[in-house]
Amino acid sequence: MCQGALFLFNGGQPESRKNVQAVFWKQGNNPPFHFISCAEGNSGSRMRAGIVVDGKGQSRIWGDRIVIDWKEEAEKTYGFRVDVLRRGRGSWILETDLGLRLLKEYRGSVNRLEFEEAVLQSLDGMETLKADQYVRNSEGELLSTAEDGTRYIVKEWFADRECDLKDEREVLSAVRALALLHRQFRMIKRQETWNMRSMISLPLFEAMRRHNRELKKARTFIRGKRKKNEFELRVIGNFEIFAAQAVEAERGMEKLYEIHGKEIADGYAVCHGEPDYHHILIGNGYTAVTEFNQMHLGVQMEDLYYFLRKIMEKHDWNERLGRQVMESYERVLPVSEVERQGLYYLFLYPEKYWKQINFYYNANKAWVPAKSTEKIRKLEAQQEARESFIQTVIQGV
């Protein structure tokens, strides 16, 4: 009997090996598979799975539970030959006769896919900047449906590694790629069909206002607790400092929109939406930007803020590196005075602080993970360096 790997999914929620074994053993099956990750189906639902044996798919049906052979499914639907099938991050990586491909479940709309494809095709053919282009199936469709009803997409993929935020040369290459991406996206003519809610960004101060309300609710809750843990005590101790920055950022951003609203709206361009280092791959002579599922029309400075903040958190708000990042970006795409002001208020807003408190407030408040407490400690420790960076690098450049 062969040894393989069984993956079961139902909303991506992990379940114990014991529960999954019970499902199959109850039906008289004794598959010799090695369990890597799994999920138990809800009552009345059908369980979806994929089996890998020596890099190739195997299809089975146990009772009413369909097990999809993704190798066979991809070959049948897309017409290429799959030589190797392996797991990726929430996806399948396919080594095909046409090159590397990524297969992933998709839950959005076809209109959304068409929006992303139209934008990404503007990057097709560029030598130093690449993107994970969508691959249409044999019927010319972007979206495919497997036997069990799973909707999925296939994209071109890359074997390159993720950007190393500890490597300054790679960081500067990555931010240059982001600037090239933004410059190319500004050339794209907006289409009338790009009017879905997920495609257009709301004014940036609206999210700040919502987050500030959430901060106040969480602080009120913590104040009312008699016995407080370390996380809660630290929040009580540092809340006024971070809250003051949050309010100043919201008011400043709203005023910026009041004065320059038309200029900001006219300057809306396509944004990546989540330019994380996981989504920037360093290739041989090129940089690949991937995972555009958060792409939208909005303020591109939000992308730059997101990526630069991640870099600075890793480098303890190193001002020298921060200046180099800004210079690398502006050598490709200069930043206007209004954009710089918006970037200032984005950095002034204590987003990481809000995230930790919001996570606490919406989770099990009786037990706070040690990791959350450590993150609050780190935010406190980095606060002085963060403020200096904002004043000298962002506001003072």
Residue positions per predicted region:
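Juxta-kinase regulatory segment immediately upstream of eukaryotic protein kinase catalytic domains
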Residues: 54-78
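ATP-binding glycine-rich phosphate-binding loop
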Residues: 70-95
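Active-site acidic catalytic loop and adjacent metal/ATP-binding pocket
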Residues: 91-93, 134, 251-301
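ATP-binding pocket architecture of kinase catalytic cores
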Residues: 99-196
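ATP-dependent phospho-/nucleotidyl transfer catalytic cores
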Residues: 104, 194-270
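A glycine-centered beta->alpha junction motif in the catalytic cores
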Residues: 152-165, 217-224, 349-367
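Active-site activation/catalytic loop segments of kinase-like enzymes and analogous catalytic loops
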Residues: 301-334, 347-367
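ATP/Mg2+ or Mg2+-diphosphate-binding catalytic cores
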Residues: 354-397
